[in-house]
């Protein structure tokens, strides 16, 4: 008889989903995060998109990821090292393993670890675990692609659509690891794909298959996890991003100051969400203008400041360079101006989907140019 599986009781745990762009890691991570928040955990998430427009499948530069930090108490960051890593292909394992703790549980899709996949991911041999120094006992090696194809063989779906359901198998397995109620996952899927009932049925079936796989092979899993939950106080809850929180903060600041809020902005990733969110709240005294370029966005905000509004312009690194002339105009005119810089990787045009804190030195000197 197999010994009972160890259950790790943790105050907080970090889970990282990773795979190709298009493997649905963002959706799987979002669902798991929502379920965890619903049962009473505090969460902080970090989506990671490849900077390439369309990287080759299975390549190192095309790895997409989603990290969630789950806690019994307050959680303030997405976490650093992960306790559980889901790697849907060899490139994901190669790129993300350095984020793992020494005793992390690693889930892989063995169907995506063929010789060709390993060469694409810059492995020098077929012994990828040995090459990276990974303890095989910490790895849940599952033929996810094969099992999803078998699960949906009679669904009438084409092969491409079937492969898009692999993320749900991984999600089901992770839900088993954390003893999450699948009913919450199913409810999410029914709402998400309400207009596509066939897709709802297929995804539910695959999630259940992943969960059952965990039950059936639990002896090969080093341990499962338990994070204490708390009973939520009844009220209104929402998923909130940094950009949305910034938008709400600006609205609140304008209200407290007794001023109208004006945002003059030019769309630029990853700051555009602030413009999108504020545009929804014209009834709260918010005026937004999508300008023709970065300089115009800043100049329009300066005009609004002169007229007595709480004036804001939003941008990212490349836009700061372009706005510098207008920013100095605000300085010499002694007009208050809020500039939101949602930083991305640089230099020059930079990496729209990556984060970096490298604009600060430039920003400290912008007002000294005049």
Task: Locate predicted features.
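Active-site cofactor/cluster-binding pocket
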Residues: 1-257
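Conserved small/polar residues in nucleotide/adenosyl-binding loops
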Residues: 363-370
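Thiamine diphosphate
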Residues: 12-100, 269-362
